[in-house]
Amino acid sequence: MAPTPELSPETLARHLAVLGPASGYCVAYSGGLDSTVLLHLMAALSAARELPLRAVHIHHGLQPQADAWAEHCRQQAAALGVDCLVLPVEVRRDSGEGLEAAARQARYAALASHLQSGEALLTAHHADDQAETVLLHLLRGSGPRGLAGMRAQRPLGRGRLLRPLLPWPRERLRAYGDTHALCWVEDPSNAHVAHDRNWLRHTLWPVLTQRWPDASRRVGRAAGEQAEAEALLRELAGEDLARHPPGPGLAVSVLARLSPARARNLVRHWLLMSGLRPPPRARLEQGLADLIRAGRDRQPVLTWPEGELRRYRDRIHRLPAGGPPPWPGPDREWDLRVPLVVPGVGVLRLVRADEGIAPSLIGAEGLSVGRRRRGERCQLAHDPGHRPLSKRFQEAGIPPWERDRVPILRRGEEVVAIANLGTAKRFTARPGYRLICEEHGPDGG
């Protein structure tokens, strides 16, 4: 392996160029050694190349020294000629994921919300951090995605998250800090070996580096191989997804033709595409097999803390944990003039059509939108007579858990239209408007 270059503003600039351009840079500045070194390097780059630069310090309020750390960051950034914004965040202690994970979630949410368009957020993760991450994932039994460790870049908010210090080990950062007489704070919680990462850092890592001094580079190289394998699996999942017939969710008939490993790979990446973290391997293996083997008249459910998979007929649907939100409250008045947002359901709008809702209804009084009512019936444009809405939903293949969320447009007590299904005969004109609902949900298409 080629030796790691010296850590300097020039080498950092070359590495940033590989990661791509940005409209400006924002350093996530905790006040510790790593982010202090990064801010010092970026301040030198900013002065030499007139790069827009600012810093953000997240005030978690979890340590007695939190206020002092925030003031330290303001002063150190000011000494470098960099504006530093202090953002207080509230860390949920009842999240069920542990205090460290909750703090990380709150931190990134705050950083993402304050990132400007095209701006790059820089974090100071280095090669030793990457090695620790990979080893922790290995001990948790993770697959290629976890063993790939932290990505050098990813989308975040309106910009990107960059980790430009990943090529350099911790010792290089400390040497840089000592050489430039930098001042940083020490978080006492980093010494608590009750945390897995701290135990690995203070207990196991010194033993590994005594035997293999370049252990972080070796683990980093392995992470790169795993990242490539994960990219290939993602590409394969994309090809398998493209073979699915149109419609929401995944087709059971297509999944059943794949090997179990390939089917799990497709489902895993399909969930990640929607922002849902997949279930653990054993849960996914058994649950997906049950979903595929179930008869068409069955409605099995695979649940895990982050979401659900449900089967209806030949499709598997992804849903948030606990299922979709119910219809929000009573009927809503709507005069059809502008789109209507129904929280948790979607956006209702009219689109021109050869046949549909009569234009004379736009702006009319007495119009409202709500969910179906018990025993409700209607006659759509080409029906011979009135039929129950429940029967229509079943024929349209609408899953049972969605039927109470289908928007129904009424005038008084009469059904005018059913979103995405049709217009009542009595209110139909040529030309007219179709009532459509563009869904918000994770399985909106």
UniProtKB/Swiss-Prot annotation:
Gene3D superfamilies: 1.20.59.20, HUPs (3.40.50.620). GO terms for biological process: tRNA modification. GO terms for molecular function: ATP binding; tRNA(Ile)-lysidine synthase activity. It catalyses: cytidine(34) in tRNA(Ile2) + L-lysine + ATP = lysidine(34) in tRNA(Ile2) + AMP + diphosphate + H(+). ATP binds at S30, G31, G32, L33, D34, S35. InterPro entries: Lysidine-tRNA-synth_C (IPR012796), Rossmann-like_a/b/a_fold (IPR014729), TilS/TtcA_N (IPR011063), tRNA_Ile_lys_synt (IPR012094), tRNA_Ile_lys_synt_N (IPR012795), tRNA_Ile_lys_synt_subst-bd (IPR015262). Keywords: ATP-binding, Cytoplasm, Ligase, Nucleotide-binding, tRNA processing. Its EC number is 6.3.4.19. Pfam families: ATP_bind_3, TilS, TilS_C. CDD domains: TilS_N. It is an enzyme of class 6 (ligase). It is found in: Cytoplasm. One of its GO terms (cellular component) is cytoplasm. The keyword Cell inner membrane does not apply. Belongs to the tRNA(Ile)-lysidine synthase family. The N-terminal region contains the highly conserved SGGXDS motif, predicted to be a P-loop motif involved in ATP binding. Ligates lysine onto the cytidine present at position 34 of the AUA codon-specific tRNA(Ile) that contains the anticodon CAU, in an ATP-dependent manner. Cytidine is converted to lysidine, thus changing the amino acid specificity of the tRNA from methionine to isoleucine. This is tRNA(Ile)-lysidine synthase. It comes from Alkalilimnicola ehrlichii (strain ATCC BAA-1101 / DSM 17681 / MLHE-1).
